[in-house]
């Protein structure tokens, strides 16, 4: 049996990474009591199309399909298939999917230490023909991945890798033109700096669920290159929304402290605030021709539509927006949002 939890480990960077140098510029709004952050010299993100992470994510996706999971959490409603597969290849692939279905089909990547560890460990494995060597992965999982690797490489990996590289290239121009300003604005808004090292982004053909996943120790985003639900600017905005989880502690702590002082449950207000902030700041940076048609991800996808989130939207629009507009300070915005929660 696989262990239920594994220790965290920093995945080693790949020599073949694709780094896009989007450097931080000075903030667009600085008050008298705020100093602009030092100019950033490291890239914001480091992009990879890693064979082993892609294989793992594909098998996880196939396992969800076999279990009949909702299509909204998947990028395709049909299992992978290929003409001319040998009977041995079919048997090897079915065995790998069966293993994943037995161990992972009823689990989510978000918050699952074991799945996080698998993804992080595989991200440190180069595709150089050598056998997998992460010390924290159990031998039975390594054996399954090795058995499936040849099948995946023969039938699907070339097309998936091409799709991933196209996705990475599609973000390059926007990162160059919008990335520095968006990162500067969001870190200023949240009173916390971007991580010192570039955030690793593993681009995969499939990512369960919703087409993206994030872990913060270390910062690591996994993003689908084929997700039909996140087209165009949604992808770019989501990239920065996910990144903002890595510099949200100051805001989260401020909300929780104010909530205790006012005897209010602030719940997931911090998370709705991240969606709201990335949308507002991205719109401000877009050319006028795009601003007119741009709808932030949170609104377009009805993120604020269920549970306590309609109330979060109201306090964000009433109390956080004036802060983003420079009309009130951070402390007043935090106090007002909590006070206006039901």
Model-based region annotation:
Residues 1-8:
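N-terminal secretory signal peptides that target proteins for export/translocation
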Residues 13-25:
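Bacterial N-terminal signal peptides
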Residues 30-32:
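Boundary at the C-terminal end of the N-terminal hydrophobic targeting segment
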Residues 34-110, 123, 251-252, 259-312:
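Post-HExxH zinc-binding segment in Zn-dependent metallohydrolases
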Residues 159-216:
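Auxiliary, metal-adjacent structural segments of Zn-dependent hydrolase domains
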Residues 223-239:
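Short pre-active-site segment immediately N-terminal to the catalytic Zn-binding motif
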Residues 236-253:
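Active-site recognition of the HExxH zinc-binding catalytic motif
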Residues 294-342:
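Pan-zinc metallopeptidase signature
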